[in-house]
Structure formats: C-alpha cells, structure tokens
Design a protein with these regions (language model features):
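N-terminal extracellular ligand-recognition/capping segment immediately after the signal peptide
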Residues: 44-65, 69-75
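Short, compositionally biased P/S/T/A/G/V-rich stretches that sit at domain boundaries
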Residues: 279-314, 321
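Acidic glycine-/aspartate-rich tracts in secreted/extracellular proteins
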Residues: 53-54, 69-73, 224, 228-229, ...
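Right-handed parallel beta-helix/beta-spiral solenoid domain characteristic of secreted/periplasmic
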Residues: 65-113, 126
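Bacterial Sec-dependent N-terminal signal peptides
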Residues: 1-16
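Predominantly extracellular beta-rich ligand-binding scaffolds that present long acidic/polar faces
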Residues: 102, 108-114, 127-260
Length: 324
C-alpha cells in the first residue's frame, strides 16, 4: 500500500494522526484538524482511523468507517482514548449504499441528524447527547450515552449499552442487556414509547411518579431499581419475570451517580437474576458481554521528524498496537 503525508502539521514529537484508507492507498493527516481534512478527502466506503488524542469535530456527510483508539478516559492496555471535541451533524445523502460505522470514540458534545440513513452502527463509544431522526435499522453496541438519546421516526437496536434519558418519538426501539436511566430531569422511563426490553436493568427516580414505563412497551426478564411505588412495570401489559431492587443489592459500584470509572458489575445476588437466555441481566450478559476494547488496531504513537533528509525523505515512526 502507498502512504502519502499531509505536510500541513508535522511535529518532532508524537502527533495527532488520522489515516485515510481509500482503494488500497493510505493517506495520513496530522494535527487537531486531521479528522476534518481526512473526511474532506474521503469517499463513501472509505475508512478513517484516529490515534489517541483530541480532534476537532467535523460534520459527517459521507458513509465512512470512523475508528478511534477507544472511548475510555483511562488507559486500556496502555492506549489512551480518542476524543472528538465539538458538536457535529450526520447528513449523508439518501440512497447511498455504503454504511456509516463509528467505533471507539469519546464525544461528549451533541450529535444530531435528520437524514434518511439505513444501517448506521455505533460501537464501543462514549457519547454525550445524541439526537437522531429518520434512522432505519441503526444499531448501538457497547456504547455509553451519558446525557440523553432522542430518537424520532427511527428504529434502533441497543445491545449491552448504558443509556440515559432515552426518548423515542414515533420510533421503535429494542434494548438487549442494557442499563436505562431516568436521571430526573423530566425525560426518562416514562418516555420509552413502543420499546421492547429484554434482560435490562432500569434505573428510576424514587421521588418521581413518572418512572413507570408506558403501556406501549413490552418487557421480558428485567429489573427495576430505585423506582417509584416499587414498580416501573405497573402499566406494562406484557411484563414477564420482572424484579424490583435497590442499588446496593444490584450493583457493586453504582449508586445512581454516573462516573466514567464505574463498571456496572452486578453483585453476586443480582447475578442470579437471569435473562431470557440464561445469562445475567445488564451489560455483561447476553450474546455480547460488555467490553470497551475496540476491535481494530490502535495507532499508539506517531513521531515525525522535524526535517527531511538530504535526499528529500521524511522520517515517520508510526506504532500500531494490535488487539489482544
């Protein structure tokens, strides 16, 4: 494969780097705007890989695969996270056959979209505020959505995710082995219209009478924690094998206040509350037990020489860590 270098921002020390893979050729871009520059040069179906570090956000108008080094704020196998700073939109033209995939990023600002997009995937990413409209067959795997999730005229599947304040409007959502949270700001469990929940743990606000799921939901093998009147399932017509619990009986390290280092591991008692498939409820059960480690190799270091050699060559040292 060929490697070409964008010389706009090269440094003697370790650099931010985005690599663009297009038809077998790899192009590297450097600096905080590397993601923006790589996206401008990309075509539908291309892949952009980001190193650890903080990149400026850019609107996504192409169905690309965007991969980061990971979402965690602490190190995973000595790999720091990839952070994207600033709001961005997803506006991909209708009818594009390629699919959008976003994996291994930390983005705490707002992602919004109202384009008709099918098959988008969000994997192993920590997201702040997400607002999607007209998304079909979108999927979220091993994600943490820590502020809110708005869905309008969309259908999405969530596997082994933490989702705060989810509000689907004219949407159909399926949640498998997820943790869903009502943080008490007026949006929460009562807004989960037409949702199907399997093997999930629902966190309510004890002081709020709005913690009950709407009657349009179907619920299988789920547990409600800290819910008003001891039940969030009261109005649900189909609610099979549901439990009620409190924080200390359910989680080892979570008491209702989110922080990045909380594992959401269950207590020994809670591990006995099995889902429909015989595994534990929550994010560590099911067919896809939660694991924040990304599936792609990580760019862990990029050193670029300050000067070229006498024959015009520029020394570039890129270190890539494979998945263990």
């Amino acid at each position: 494969m060929l490697l070409s270098l964008s010389a706009a921002n090269v440094f003697a020390q370790s650099s931010l780097i985005a690599t663009l893979s297009h038809e077998g050729e790899i192009t590297a871009f450097y600096g905080a705007d590397a993601l923006k520059e790589a996206h401008e040069a990309a075509a539908h179906g291309d892949a952009i890989t980001l190193s650890s570090g903080t990149f400026s956000a850019t609107d996504i108008t192409k169905a690309i695969t965007l991969r980061g080094a990971g979402m965690q704020v602490y190190t995973i196998n000595n790999v720091l996270p990839t952070l994207i700073n600033g709001d961005f939109t997803i506006q991909i033209a209708e009818g594009v056959s390629e699919k959008l995939t976003i994996e291994g990023i930390c983005h705490l600002d707002r992602i919004s979209s109202n384009c008709k997009l099918s098959g988008a995937r969000f994997i192993k990413s920590r997201l702040g505020r997400v607002s999607l409209a007209y998304f079909a067959n979108a999927s979220f795997l091993h994600c943490k959505i820590i502020e809110y999730m708005y869905l309008e005229h969309s259908d999405c599947i969530f596997n082994n995710c933490y989702v705060a304040d989810c509000r689907p409007t004219n949407s159909s959502s399926q949640f498998y082995n997820c943790i869903l949270v009502d943080d008490g700001d007026g949006i929460g469990l009562k807004d989960l219209e037409y949702a199907s929940l399997y093997n999930c743990i629902l966190i309510g606000k004890e002081s709020s009478s709005g913690d009950r799921l709407p009657s349009s939901c179907v619920v299988y093998n789920c547990t409600g924690v800290n819910c008003y009147d001891a039940t969030c399932f009261k109005d649900v017509p189909i609610a099979l094998n549901v439990e009620q619990s409190i924080f200390t009986d359910t989680f080892k390290d979570y008491t209702g206040i989110y922080s990045d280092d909380i594992t959401f591991e269950l207590t020994d008692k809670a591990k006995k509350w099995l889902g429909t498939d015989g595994t534990q409820q929550g994010i560590y059960g099911g067919n896809f037990p939660y694991d924040p480690t990304t599936s792609n190799p990580h760019i862990t270091k990029c050193n670029v020489a300050a000067k070229s050699t006498a024959d015009g060559k520029l020394s570039v040292d890129i270190e890539v860590a494979g998945v263990e």
